[in-house]
């Protein structure tokens, strides 16, 4: 086998005899073809040598150039972590929004969310996200302060033209929400998530990889709920989430070529602006609040860098920024004095990656 990372030099040339034939044989009868190995297209350099009785074809070198498709495939595989980060971000502040919709009733709560997403290159993913938590209300001068604790579990899977796999994630976080008498509010949350991943790729001989990663999240949201009437409101809002996603590295061989791909820890910074509107409907012993939201979510920092290495050298692929429009509609219902149930539908559009549809159901018991 040829070590493709050991480039031939004038002092150390390859000279591997491949085949020989009678002297009068046409030189074009034996030709070498281009082959994709690793992240490169490799073309052998074949020379002929003629003696009195035969002609010999020998491998004296090779030319390597980057294969753009393999490079894109590697970058797409490593972008799965960012998409998982984004799905966690979209679920960070759900509980605090519920608190405003149920007039600030603290208690125990549970939420389940299921969704699907898609991007170019045949990429699609789906996930089921479960949250449970408990919070407490503190009545202060001019505001109500809620503090709480949450734990989460997410099962997700993703696939594209050249890879597929699944991730199991568990996380825990602390949150606080300050709701001022004026209608203004501030939400804060910090969260840690551990991910166990298993992915199989069909490019560059990568095969199946099991690996663990983790991520941190720190989010803040501020807004103002303005009551148009006693039962109807409009709520402009802005959110900023800063985080950290751990890196990973793979090393292997493809047909004798040493390969590696890695990304370092990186720090996403995601912003969102939007507006929600809502209206409550009530009867003698029931109350339902309908809500609709429209927002714009955007990356403020590029998302990491993927580094590939093979015979053609090192390739650095910088992460791209993305943005999308967010849309949601939902209902919150009072079942009994201390029991609430909510249902919400969401999707996004105009992004490189979009949530095609997501449904979120939550149950709350106040005490």
What residue spans do the PLM features occupy?
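Outer membrane beta-barrel translocator domains of Type V secretion systems
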Residues: 64-230, 234, 345-346, 351, ...
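Extracellular, surface-exposed repeat/solenoid domains
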Residues: 1-62
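Outer-membrane beta-barrel porins/channels
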Residues: 234-235, 239, 253, 273, ...
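Short secondary-structure subsegments characteristic of cysteine-rich extracellular domains
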Residues: 2-26, 123-138, 257-266
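Residues on the lipid-exposed face of transmembrane beta-strands in outer-membrane beta-barrel proteins
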Residues: 132-136, 172-178, 190, 220-224, ...
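Solvent-exposed, glycine/polar-rich loop segments of beta-barrel outer-membrane systems
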Residues: 73-77, 161-166, 195-212, 244-267, ...
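Short, structured loop/turn "capping" segments at alpha-beta junctions
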Residues: 229-235, 245-249, 283-288
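Outer membrane beta-barrel transmembrane domains
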Residues: 228, 260-367
């Amino acid at each position: 086998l040829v070590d493709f990372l050991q480039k031939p030099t004038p002092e150390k040339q390859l000279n591997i005899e491949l085949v020989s034939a009678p002297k009068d044989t046409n030189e074009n009868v034996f030709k070498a073809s281009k082959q994709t190995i690793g992240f490169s297209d490799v073309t052998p350099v074949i020379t002929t040598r003629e003696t009195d009785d035969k002609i010999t074809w020998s491998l004296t070198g090779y030319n390597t150039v980057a294969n753009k498709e393999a490079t894109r495939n590697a970058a797409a595989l490593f972008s799965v972590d960012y998409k998982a980060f984004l799905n966690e971000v979209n679920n960070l502040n759900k509980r605090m929004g519920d608190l405003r919709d149920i007039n600030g009733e603290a208690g125990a709560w549970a939420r389940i969310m299921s969704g699907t997403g898609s991007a170019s290159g045949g990429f699609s993913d789906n996930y089921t996200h479960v949250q449970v938590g408990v919070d407490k209300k503190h009545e202060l001068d001019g505001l109500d302060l809620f503090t709480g604790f949450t734990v989460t579990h997410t099962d997700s899977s993703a696939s594209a033209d050249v890879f597929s796999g699944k991730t199991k994630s568990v996380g825990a976080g602390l949150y606080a929400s300050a709701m001022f008498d004026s209608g203004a509010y501030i939400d804060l949350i910090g969260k840690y998530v551990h991910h166990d991943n298993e992915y199989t790729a069909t490019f560059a001989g990568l095969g199946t990889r099991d690996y663990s990663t983790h991520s941190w999240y720190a989010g803040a949201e501020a807004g103002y709920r303005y009551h148009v009437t006693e039962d109807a409101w409009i709520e402009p809002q802005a959110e900023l989430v800063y985080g950290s996603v751990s890196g990973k590295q793979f090393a292997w061989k493809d047909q004798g070529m040493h390969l590696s791909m890695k990304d370092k820890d990186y720090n996403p910074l995601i912003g969102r602006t939007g507006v929600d509107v809502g209206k409550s409907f009530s009867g003698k012993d029931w109350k339902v609040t309908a809500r609709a939201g429209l927002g714009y979510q955007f990356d403020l920092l590029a998302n990491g860098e993927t580094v590939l290495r093979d015979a053609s050298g090192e390739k650095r692929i910088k992460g791209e920024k993305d943005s999308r429009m967010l849309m949601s509609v939902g209902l919150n219902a009072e079942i009994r004095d201390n029991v609430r149930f909510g249902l919400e539908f969401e999707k996004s559009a105009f992004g490189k990656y979009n949530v095609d549809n997501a449904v979120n159901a939550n149950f709350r018991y106040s005490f």
